[in-house]
């Protein structure tokens, strides 16, 4: 008995029909895409007061070009955490981009991942209680703190009743959300799903914590040149704020409502390392297995893959492990792009953002240049796209996302 796959009709055909994102380059995805193709960077010197207050070792990052809160009313600010406000903003934008379709709410799901959720409200609530006692804690504190809050806000906003879910798997959360949304659809539990990831803003505590792990770049004098995925001289990642969502649905559902698909979502692979809390397994075996599984479910072979959108954080061990994973999966012939070189790392949102970029590569037949890839690492044998955009006949692509805790997620996409 053969493995069921999208290619052999074992799973229904799933398509991507709308995308949206906000980034440190632009508040909309199409302008972000143009900026990436032009070699722009969203990473700059941070001017936040907390940088000098705490004399942080890392003084660079990428704030959103257009702050989420500039679109929020007074009640939104009081009743929702930051990621919930981002979810509301992006959910509305995505639905408008999709043409505000009429869908059956009982066949409509929402899956949105995050790394920390509304964690800032924990600190705020503690400070209020410390200053004035328990009665100063807002009755809305729980709903603002809960990690599933952003997905719940979108589900309420759009009326989704086929399930609202929130993967919390560190840096793979956004991609895992898309994977679970795909599963909801191919298992017959939904026809359409909003999926993606959101994350909080750059703050002092996360910078301090990741810096103490020696995971972040300290090239403070060269912000735009700091994030150097796969480069021999890479020294860590840089934070870059973002949020991203996509609308996926069965091809049959999309055609029935007259939607124009952007790409196909063909398969999703999820594995774990069982190796270390924060370090990837250097051999890349289980990460590579996630890639292989996504191809199996898609009905593709490694030779079919023209492009890999890499997790590429620019940490010395992470990039080397990913290169091994790509080799293990047999996809080392593919053209590789590392978006974090330009956009930085948005933790729970980044997998969704990079999935959206993968869709745009397949739509437009072009891969943006990986910034700051100047000195190839002799230990990494990959075809990294750098210097200028690379145009080509890209049919199939894989997006990789790997998270602390040993989480590995790979998504297989196809040109429509």
UniProtKB/Swiss-Prot annotation:
Disulfide pairs here are none
Indicate the segments forming the Ketosynthase family 3 (KS3) domain, all copies: 11-415
**Entry EC no(s):** 2.3.1.293
Q: Which residues bind substrate?
A: 311, 345
User: What's the effect of swapping residue 171 to Q?
Assistant: Mimics structural changes caused by acyl-enzyme formation
Q: In which pathway does it act?
A: Lipid metabolism; mycolic acid biosynthesis
Q: What is its main location?
A: cytoplasm
Activation/inhibition comment: Phosphorylation decreases the condensation activity.
Q: Which reaction does it catalyse?
A: an ultra-long-chain mono-unsaturated fatty acyl-[ACP] + malonyl-[ACP] + H(+) = a 3-oxo-ultra-long-chain mono-unsaturated fatty acyl-[ACP] + holo-[ACP] + CO2; hexadecanoyl-[ACP] + malonyl-[ACP] + H(+) = 3-oxooctadecanoyl-[ACP] + holo-[ACP] + CO2
> What's the domain of life for this entry?
Bacteria
* UniProt keyword annotations, A-Z: Acyltransferase, Cytoplasm, Fatty acid biosynthesis, Fatty acid metabolism, Lipid biosynthesis, Lipid metabolism, Phosphoprotein, Transferase
Q: Which GO terms describe its biological process?
A: fatty acid biosynthetic process; fatty acid elongation; fatty acid elongation, saturated fatty acid
Q: Which GO terms describe its molecular function?
A: 3-oxoacyl-[acyl-carrier-protein] synthase activity; identical protein binding
Describe the PTM: Phosphorylated in vitro by several Ser/Thr protein kinases (STPKs). Highly phosphorylated in vivo on threonines. Can be dephosphorylated by the Ser/Thr phosphatase PstP.
Known outcome of mutating residue 413 to L: Increases resistance to isoniazid
Gene3D superfamilies recorded for this chain? 3.40.47.10
Intracellular or extracellular location(s): Cytoplasm
* Any one GO cellular component localisation term in the record: plasma membrane
Q: What is known of its domains?
A: Phe-404 residue probably plays a key role in the activation of the enzyme at the beginning of the catalytic cycle. A conformational change of Phe-404, possibly triggered by the substrate, is central for the activation because it switches KasA to the sufficiently reactive zwitterionic state.
What function is annotated for this protein? Part of the mycobacterial fatty acid elongation system FAS-II, which is involved in mycolic acid biosynthesis. Catalyzes the elongation of long chain acyl-ACP substrates by the addition of two carbons from malonyl-ACP to an acyl acceptor. Involved in the initial extension of the mycolate chain and forms monounsaturated fatty acids that averaged 40 carbons in length.
Assembly mode? Homodimer.
Q: Which NCBIfam families match?
A: PRK07314.1 (NF005589), PRK07910.1 (NF005916)
Q: Which family does it belong to?
A: Belongs to the thiolase-like superfamily. Beta-ketoacyl-ACP synthases family.
Matching PANTHER family: 3-OXOACYL-[ACYL-CARRIER-PROTEIN] SYNTHASE, MITOCHONDRIAL, POLYKETIDE SYNTHASE-RELATED
The note filed under miscellaneous reads:
Identified as a drug target. Inhibited by isoniazid (INH), thiolactomycin (TLM) and related analogs. Highly sensitive to cerulenin. Is the biological target of GSK3011724A, an indazole sulfonamide. Inhibited by the indazole JSF-3285, which is a promising preclinical candidate for tuberculosis.
Instruction: Supply the name of the protein.
Output: 3-oxoacyl-[acyl-carrier-protein] synthase 1
Organism equals Mycobacterium tuberculosis (strain ATCC 25618 / H37Rv)
- Primary gene name: kasA
């Amino acid at each position: 008995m053969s493995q069921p796959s999208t290619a052999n009709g074992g799973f229904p055909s799933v398509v991507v029909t709308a995308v949206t994102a906000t980034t440190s380059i632009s508040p909309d995805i199409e302008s972000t895409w143009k900026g990436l193709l032009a070699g722009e960077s969203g990473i700059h010197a941070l001017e936040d007061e907390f940088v000098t207050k705490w004399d942080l070792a890392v003084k660079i990052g990428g704030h959103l070009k257009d702050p989420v809160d500039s679109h929020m009313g007074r009640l939104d600010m009081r009743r929702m955490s930051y990621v919930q406000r981002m979810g509301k903003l992006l959910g509305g934008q995505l639905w408008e981009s999709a043409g505000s379709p009429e869908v059956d709410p009982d066949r409509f799901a929402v899956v949105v991942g995050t790394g920390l959720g509304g964690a800032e409200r924990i600190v705020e609530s503690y400070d209020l209680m410390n200053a004035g006692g328990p009665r100063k804690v807002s009755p809305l504190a729980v709903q603002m703190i809960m990690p599933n809050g952003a997905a719940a806000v979108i589900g309420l906003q759009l009326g989704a009743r086929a399930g609202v879910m929130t993967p919390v798997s560190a840096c793979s959360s956004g991609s895992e959300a898309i994977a679970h949304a795909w599963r909801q659809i191919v298992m017959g539990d939904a026809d359409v799903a909003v999926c993606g990831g959101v994350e909080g803003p750059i703050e002092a505590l996360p910078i301090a914590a990741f810096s103490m792990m020696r995971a972040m770049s300290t090239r403070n004098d060269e912000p735009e040149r700091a994030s150097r995925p796969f480069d021999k001289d890479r020294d860590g990642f840089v934070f870059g704020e973002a949020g991203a969502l996509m609308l996926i649905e069965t091809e049959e559902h999309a055609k029935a409502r007259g939607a124009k698909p952007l790409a196909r979502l063909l398969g999703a692979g999820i594995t774990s390392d069982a190796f270390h809390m924060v370090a990837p397994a250097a051999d890349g075996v289980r990460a590579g297995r996630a890639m292989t599984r996504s191809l199996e479910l898609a009905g593709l072979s490694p030779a079919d893959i023209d492009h890999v959108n890499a997790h590429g954080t620019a940490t010395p061990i992470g990039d080397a492990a990913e290169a091994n994973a790509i080799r293990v999966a047999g996809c080392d012939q593919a053209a590789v792009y590392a978006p974090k070189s330009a956009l930085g790392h948005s933790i729970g949102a980044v997998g969704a953002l990079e999935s959206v970029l993968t869709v745009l590569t397949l739509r437009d037949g072009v891969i943006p240049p990986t910034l700051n890839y100047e000195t190839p690492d002799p230990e990494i044998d990959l075809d990294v796209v750098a210097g200028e955009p690379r145009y080509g006949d890209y049919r199939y692509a894989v997006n990789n996302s790997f998270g602390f805790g040993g989480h590995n997620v790979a998504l297989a996409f196809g040109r429509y």
